[in-house]
Amino acid sequence: MLRSSFKTLSAKAAAQLDQELMSTGAFSIDQLMELAGLSVAQAIYKQYPPKKSCNNTVLVLVGPGNNGGDGLVAARHLKLWGGYDPILYYPKRTKNQLYSNLVTQLHDLDVNELESVEDVKRLVSVPQAGVDLIIDSLFGFSFKPPIRAPFDELIRYLAENHDKIAPIVSVDIPSGWDVDKGPTDLDINATMLVSLTAPKPCAARFVDSSAEKIHYLGGRFINPKIAKKYDIEELVDLYEGNELIVKFV
C-alpha cells in the first residue's frame, strides 16, 4: 500500500461511527478507550521496544477528552509490560469518573506526574533526564482551533523545539492540526502517528511530509457491517491474525 493511498474518515464521519459503535454496536466508551489505548501502546512497543540496559522514559501529554484517555490507557499498558517509565502531564482534568479511575490506576503503579508546562520544558530539554519518547494525546479529531490555555504554550514549545527533543508519537492526529487540512501555524512535527479506527484526512499530509514519518493503524473493533457502511473494509482487512495494529509501508 502506498504511503498516502489509504481510506480516510472525515471528522464528521468518525464522530458518527463512534456514536454508532456506542448505540447499535453496544460498545461502552470504556471499552473503546481501552482498545484504542492498547493499540497505541502496542504500536509504541513495536516501534520503540524497551532497552535492555534501562527503562524507556515516556512523557505522556494528556488532553481533556477521549484522546487524553487513550494516552492514559497506553501509559498503563506500557508500565505493566515493563521496560517503560511513563510520566504524566495532565493539566486540564475532567470530573468524569472514567478518567479519574484511569489516573488512580496509574498512581497505583507509581507513575509520576508533572505539575506545570515549565516542568515539561525542563524535563525534555535536559539530555541527562533521558526522556526517550513523548506521547501526544492532547487533542483528537474533534479539535477546533485556536489552541487555548493551558495547551497553547505547550504546543508552541513542542513546535519550536521538535528537532531538539525526543520523538513524538501522536494519537489519531498530531495535536494542533486541522483534522482535514493538516498543520496550522504550529506543527509539533510528530515522528509517528497512530490512526485509530481509520486515518483521518490529515494523515495523508503527515506521511507525505517526509519519508521518515511512521504511520500505524489501530482500534480493531469495527465489525464488517459498520466497515461496509463507512467504506473502510479495506482497512479492516489489513489486520492479520490476532494483531491489533497495522504498520503502513
Question: What are these model-predicted stretches?
Answer:
Residues 1-59, 249:
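An N-terminal, well-structured beta->alpha segment
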Residues 2-9, 21, 130-249:
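YjeF_N-associated NAD(P)HX repair module
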Residues 8-11, 26-30, 34-38, 72, ...:
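Electropositive phosphate-/nucleotide-binding environments in soluble metabolic enzymes
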Residues 28, 52-53, 116-119, 178, ...:
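Short, solvent-exposed coil/turn linker segments
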Residues 42-140, 146-171:
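Nucleotide and nucleotide-moiety/phosphate-recognizing core
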